[in-house]
């Protein structure tokens, strides 16, 4: 077995990023609390804080009296200093956002038909140019663009491997924006982006195993965070829940028959756009099976099908899922339906950009 070691510079960058992540999650916080909780020397904390301050990534927020009587300076993450263009395909929303998740500009983009990759890039570049002309950010603040797209995504190379919804295959997304939008190009599958939106708000980050299920007319899938990391799979095909097979001859856009998302779409259309008990049964079976396999601590259900549920249907779906989970009484399991997909995607785009700009693993 060969071992690789971090260079001094790589170790310094990782320490800096670890401290920045900690301040983002825990701030406002004192330097003393940082070195106590992170097991980093005082000298290292002082040096790293000075470095992050020089990059305008953290700022001081005032003083607070410590238990020993000394007044300490508190610091917090300065997400407003770094900005990103962002786009979510599901909502067709284009944003200018900062790394704190604040939306500085938003606009719904319309496409008369499914765009070709070049047409898609042209539309986003044009909107980015419009925002730039508005003077909403200083040139040095812009870090690039981050996209949430449906399909199989290689986030490391910023390429889309295959999307049945977009009818794209092997598209180099990074190349589409090269020299057209300053900074980096990040892309991730829609489910992972929404999941990060949930995970970085509220208390969900405390769960070591967390899943988000998209139940949408555009597709069905599951995304997971395990110990703080998005799961992608060996071939970037993690979470293709919509393509598990049922005993049905209904054709799917993937070219096969009987896929869960195709069957549910067919049932939905034949019911006149209503969520029927049969649809709820299929959704409950899929979610409970996934939970039985993965043993998550929290599951969130989102998407257009979930948005259409009445309160009674929502409660019934959750109960059906819980009723099919093995050894429920021995699990610390939380299941809930969320009705804010657009907001989750926007928050997730910002969170994802931060994680990619300042990686810790």
Predicted regions and their residues:
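ATP-binding/phosphotransfer module of carbohydrate and carboxylate kinases, centering on a glycine-rich
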Residues: 1-61, 68-70, 74-108, 115-137, ...
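Glycine/GP-enriched mid-protein hinge/lid loop-to-helix segment characteristic of carbohydrate kinases
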Residues: 106, 169, 182-276
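Short glycine-rich anion-binding loops that position phosphate/pyrophosphate groups of nucleotides
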Residues: 150-152, 217-219, 305-306
């Amino acid at each position: 077995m060969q071992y690789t070691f971090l260079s001094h510079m790589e170790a310094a960058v990782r320490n800096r990023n670890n401290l920045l992540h900690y301040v983002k999650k825990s701030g406002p916080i004192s330097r003393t609390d940082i070195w106590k909780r992170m097991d980093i020397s005082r000298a290292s904390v002082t040096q790293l804080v000075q470095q992050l301050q020089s990059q305008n990534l953290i700022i001081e927020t005032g003083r607070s009296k410590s238990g020993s009587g000394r007044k300490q300076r508190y610091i917090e993450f300065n997400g407003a200093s770094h900005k990103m263009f962002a786009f979510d395909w599901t909502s067709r929303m284009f944003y200018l956002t900062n790394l704190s998740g604040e939306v500085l500009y938003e606009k719904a983009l319309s496409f008369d038909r499914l765009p070709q990759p070049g047409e898609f890039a042209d539309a986003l570049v044009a909107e980015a140019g419009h925002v730039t002309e508005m003077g909403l950010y200083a040139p040095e603040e812009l870090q690039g663009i981050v996209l949430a797209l449906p399909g199989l995504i290689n986030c490391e190379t910023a390429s889309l491997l295959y999307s049945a919804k977009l009818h794209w295959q092997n598209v180099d997304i990074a190349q589409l924006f090269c020299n057209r939008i300053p900074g980096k190009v990040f892309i991730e599958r829609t489910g992972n982006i929404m999941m990060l939106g949930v995970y970085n708000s509220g208390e969900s980050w405390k769960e070591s195993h967390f899943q988000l299920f998209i139940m949408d007319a555009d597709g069905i899938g599951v995304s997971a965070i395990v110990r703080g990391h998005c799961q992608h799979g060996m071939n970037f095909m993690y979470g293709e829940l919509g393509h598990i097979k049922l005993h049905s001859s209904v054709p799917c856009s993937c070219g096969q028959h009987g896929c869960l998302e195709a069957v549910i779409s067919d049932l939905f259309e034949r019911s006149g756009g209503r969520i029927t008990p049969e649809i709820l049964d299929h959704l409950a079976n899929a979610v409970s099976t996934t939970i039985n396999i993965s043993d998550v601590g929290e599951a969130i259900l989102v998407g257009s099908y979930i948005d259409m549920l009445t309160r009674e249907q929502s409660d019934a779906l959750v109960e059906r899922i819980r009723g099919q989970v093995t050894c429920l009484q021995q699990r610390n399991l939380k299941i809930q339906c969320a009705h804010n997909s657009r907001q989750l995607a926007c928050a997730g785009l910002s969170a994802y950009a931060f994680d990619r700009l300042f990686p810790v693993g």
